[in-house]
Amino acid sequence: MSKPPPKPVKPGQVKVFRALYTFEPRTPDELYFEEGDIIYITDMSDTNWWKGTSKGRTGLIPSNYVAEQAESIDNPLHEAAKRGNLSWLRECLDNRVGVNGLDKAGSTALYWACHGGHKDIVDMLFTQPNIELNQQNKLGDTALHAAAWKGYADIVQLLLAKGARTDLRNNEKKLALDMATNAACASLLKKKQGTDAVRTLSNAEDYLDDEDSD
């Protein structure tokens, strides 16, 4: 009886490594890669042979080679976002690296893209249907806090248009508006908060009207 096929890997379960040496395959099933190549491990169900992808090619890699001859990259999406490296970010997403993963600071890749002012990275992350806009890191800051603090009005505008919340406070009880370092960011945030306040008031009035009509 043949064993069932391995379950497809879930986003976020992909392990990512950088090859320290070139690997020469001995069989057609094995994956060739060179020193410095990024390897995405998608199936570790076999203890001896792992399935991996590099430069669009997929094949088998001896697990002991990866363990001994490759450098683990813990948060590749975050690194790509910090550096503004769009091609690497796209490759990570294509290889199902989780878009909402958190680094040691509790930050997402979106946070670092906003912190660095990398609008093209933010645009690419926004193509992911399950992107989390309002994740707060260990300091309580969101991507909107980061963009406002660094003064990137174009990114603040993108986040607000996507539906980022303006009412979240960080550990110092500060809103994104309180963190804004220039007039353009502050103006966008004030306008959005004003719109939200009017909408909330309108909803409350509708609720009271409904109660009165009962």
Swiss-Prot record:
CDD domains: SH3_OSTF1. GO terms for biological process: signal transduction. Residues 12-71 form the SH3 domain. Pfam families: Ank (PF00023), Ank_2 (PF12796), SH3_1 (PF00018). The modification Phosphoserine is found at S202, S213. GO terms for cellular component: cytoplasm. The SH3 domain mediates interaction with SMN1. It comes from the Eukaryota. The modification Phosphothreonine is found at T200. ANK repeats lie at residues 72-101, 105-135, 139-168. Induces bone resorption, acting probably through a signaling cascade which results in the secretion of factor(s) enhancing osteoclast formation and activity. This is Osteoclast-stimulating factor 1. Keywords: Acetylation, ANK repeat, Cytoplasm, Phosphoprotein, Repeat, SH3 domain. It is found in: Cytoplasm. SMART domains: ANK (SM00248), SH3 (SM00326). InterPro entries: Ankyrin_rpt, Ankyrin_rpt-contain_sf, SH3-like_dom_sf, SH3_domain. The modification N-acetylserine is found at S2. Interacts with SRC and SMN1. Interacts with FASLG.
